[in-house]
């Protein structure tokens, strides 16, 4: 049960980091145009 919880937390963190990177890259792209 603990492993499943840890897996969910790690998955959430990775998705949050990816979303942050995507948004920052998108803003940089819009600003540079």
Swiss-Prot record:
Signal peptide: none annotated. It holds the Pfam family PetG. Keywords: Chloroplast, Electron transport, Membrane, Photosynthesis, Plastid, Thylakoid, Transmembrane, Transmembrane helix, Transport. Its main location: plastid. GO terms for biological process: cytochrome complex assembly; photosynthesis. The chain crosses the membrane at residues 5-25. GO terms for cellular component: chloroplast thylakoid membrane; cytochrome b6f complex. It is a single-pass membrane protein. InterPro entries: Cyt_6/f_cplx_su5, Cyt_6/f_cplx_su5_sf. GO terms for molecular function: electron transporter, transferring electrons within cytochrome b6/f complex of photosystem II activity. It comes from the Eukaryota. It is found in: Plastid, Chloroplast thylakoid membrane. The 4 large subunits of the cytochrome b6-f complex are cytochrome b6, subunit IV (17 kDa polypeptide, PetD), cytochrome f and the Rieske protein, while the 4 small subunits are PetG, PetL, PetM and PetN. The complex functions as a dimer. Belongs to the PetG family. Component of the cytochrome b6-f complex, which mediates electron transfer between photosystem II (PSII) and photosystem I (PSI), cyclic electron flow around PSI, and state transitions. PetG is required for either the stability or assembly of the cytochrome b6-f complex. This is Cytochrome b6-f complex subunit 5.
């Amino acid at each position: 049960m603990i492993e499943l919880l840890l897996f969910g937390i790690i998955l959430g963190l990775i998705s949050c980091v990816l979303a942050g990177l995507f948004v920052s890259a998108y803003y940089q792209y819009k600003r540079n145009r």
